[in-house]
Amino acid sequence: MAAARKDAIAVLPQPYVTAAQMKDSGLRVVLDLTREWNKVCDTQLITGVTVVRTEYAKQNPNVIAAFLTDYQKSVKAANEDIDGTAALCEEVGVVAKAAIAKKALPKCNIVYRNGQEMKKDISAYLQVLYDASPAAVGGKLPDDNFYYTEPSVLRKVMAAIRNSAK
């Protein structure tokens, strides 16, 4: 759409901005949302989250722990093995070509956040949305039960993983 008009403005996340630029070399990035966020906030800009029903998390703490462990490893692999991740992105249809992902991945800012760090980041993000329009977050900010901040079994599993990595 933006490419159809010379005066158009678009806000696109990675990898879509890179895909658009590879199709139209005249497109340019005039600001980086992460950099702009960092100028006004001391938290990480949140653009994606994993959601789980509370009941399921309580009934399946080992499944949640295993998922989060795999997720953390996946984030690490995505940042360290750009070629492999790019090929996987093409294979599963995230992007049309691995070349797009290969160029975009270093700009994607893929991170793993959990516990209080995650809660701080998401709370700040939701506060910005709420301040702009309370309806954007359902009219009120969520309470502490909204955040999954690792029950004791998960803390033990995560500590064991961190210790084994040393």
Language-model region placement:
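Conserved C-terminal helix/tail region of periplasmic/extracytoplasmic solute-binding proteins
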Residues: S123, Q127-K166
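Short secondary-structure capping/turn micro-motifs that flank functional sites
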Residues: T18-A19, V95, L105, N145-F146
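Pocket-lining segment of extracytoplasmic ligand-binding domains
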Residues: A3-C89
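A generic structural signal for short, solvent-exposed coil/turn residues
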Residues: Q21, D42, K102, G138-K140
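Short alpha-helix boundary/capping motifs
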Residues: V29-V30, R113-M118, V157-M158
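Residue-level "edge-of-site" marker
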Residues: P15, K102, M118, P142-D143
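Secondary-structure end/capping motifs
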Residues: A57-A136
